[in-house]
């Protein structure tokens, strides 16, 4: 389902709220929501440190919640909104979950799996391709990451 820019902005703001939860826990602040028919069916935020599990990325949490909501591993007719470009692992999971549309805020130059380093979501060699849109609220999404890294440097300096 195509969403207007106003609707897309609302959903990305919801993803930013999820990222803020991670920031409050000193986790890398990435947030994600999955939307179907205008309703958020999955939410997630980074929780690797808290859970001691490497796979507890925002997208993975949101996919798990959306799978439970739908009672199906296939998340057809959904859109995933995430504050930072999905990493390689999350891009693979997005494809496996059959999510057809991803909208992200800021690029991930270090480990991006959608555009920056790898193009997993659009690779024609794979059996599922995803429509990718980038740059929605990019400055806001980048700013929360910059805040996290600035706070980390301050903690190191003061310890």
From Swiss-Prot:
Pfam families linked to this entry: MafB19-deam (PF14437)
Comment on bound cofactor: Binds 1 zinc ion per subunit.
Record keyword Ribosomal protein present: no
GO terms assigned for molecular function: tRNA-specific adenosine-34 deaminase activity; zinc ion binding
Domain CMP/dCMP-type deaminase: 6-133
Residue sites binding Zn(2+) per the record: 57, 87, 90
Keyword Metal-binding attached: yes
UniProt catalytic activity: adenosine(34) in tRNA + H2O + H(+) = inosine(34) in tRNA + NH4(+)
One Gene Ontology biological process: tRNA wobble adenosine to inosine editing
Cofactor: Zn(2+)
InterPro entries according to UniProt: APOBEC/CMP_deaminase_Zn-bd (IPR016192), CMP_dCMP_dom (IPR002125), Cytidine_deaminase-like (IPR016193), tRNA_aden_deaminase (IPR028883)
Active site: 59
EC number: 3.5.4.33
Keyword set, alphabetical order: Hydrolase, Metal-binding, tRNA processing, Zinc
Family: Belongs to the cytidine and deoxycytidylate deaminase family.
Subunit structure: Homodimer.
Job description of the protein: Catalyzes the deamination of adenosine to inosine at the wobble position 34 of tRNA(Arg2).
PANTHER family: CYTOSINE DEAMINASE FAMILY MEMBER, TRNA-SPECIFIC ADENOSINE DEAMINASE
Protein name: tRNA-specific adenosine deaminase
Organism whose genome encodes this protein: Streptococcus pyogenes serotype M18 (strain MGAS8232)
The gene coding this protein: tadA
